[in-house]
């Protein structure tokens, strides 16, 4: 029997979380003396935070910047977010047609659960897998994907795929050995997805 497992990225795929993430990034950068307009920080949406903050500061400052990001995001940023139009209907249709749905995000798992719960989307997913919050390799996309596949009990990788908007989703899916699909309404470009 086919398993038909679909893993979804969260930010830029299920919800438009850009404003909250970009403002939290601005808040964190400002704490380290870097001034940027929040609307210029769209490249923070999707990739792991250590990668994006690494473009602005030395490695030893990154954990502190991530902590600053989380202060803003936990207080305000997570609410500067909304599901993309049609997402609820898509999830409903997929679920009714026997697809098993999971989330695989680089966002903190606890925050992903909170966001999806707030918007009433959590019940569509068998599991919501995200970064553990300890800034380890466990939060890397391929590892989050593998965690979701493990929770799914997936025995046939050809029956699983990930849907996302950034190269990290596509690269992570390929490294995990599953099919990938890029969406163009999020924060990644066609070129970024094609080059992954």
Where is each model-derived feature located?
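Surface-exposed amphipathic alpha-helices with a cationic face
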Residues: 88-96, 149, 170-174
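N-terminal helical cap/lid subdomain that shapes the substrate entry/recognition surface
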Residues: 2-89
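Short beta->alpha linker loops
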Residues: 44, 82-86, 107, 165, ...
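Acidic, Mg2+-coordinating phosphoryl-transfer loop and its flanking beta/alpha structural elements
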Residues: 162-196
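Conserved Lys-Pro-Asp/Glu-containing loop-to-beta segment of HAD-superfamily phosphomonoesterases
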Residues: 4-5, 140-170
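Substrate-recognition element of Asp-dependent hydrolases with the DxDx(T/V) motif
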Residues: 90-116
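Conserved H-loop
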Residues: 35, 121-126, 155
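A short, structured active-site edge motif that brings together acidic residues
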Residues: 40, 122-137
């Amino acid at each position: 029997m086919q398993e038909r497992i679909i893993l979804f990225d969260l930010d830029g795929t299920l919800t438009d979380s850009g404003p909250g993430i970009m403002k939290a990034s601005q808040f964190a950068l400002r704490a380290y003396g870097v001034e940027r307009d929040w609307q210029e920080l769209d490249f923070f949406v999707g990739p792991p935070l250590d990668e994006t903050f690494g473009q602005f500061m030395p490695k030893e400052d990154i954990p502190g910047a991530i902590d600053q990001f989380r202060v803003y995001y936990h207080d305000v940023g997570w609410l500067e977010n909304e599901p993309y139009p049609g997402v609820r209907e898509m999830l409903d249709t997929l679920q009714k047609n026997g697809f098993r749905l999971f989330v695989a995000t680089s966002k903190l798992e606890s925050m992903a659960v909170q966001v999806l719960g707030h918007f009433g989307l959590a019940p569509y997913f068998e599991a919501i897998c995200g970064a553990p919050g300890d800034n380890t390799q466990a939060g890397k996309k391929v590892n989050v994907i593998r965690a979701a596949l493990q929770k799914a009990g997936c025995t046939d990788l050809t029956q699983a795929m990930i849907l996302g908007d950034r190269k990290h989703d596509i690269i992570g899916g390929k490294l995990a050995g599953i099919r990938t699909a890029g969406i163009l309404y999020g924060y990644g470009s066609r070129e970024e997805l094609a080059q992954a």
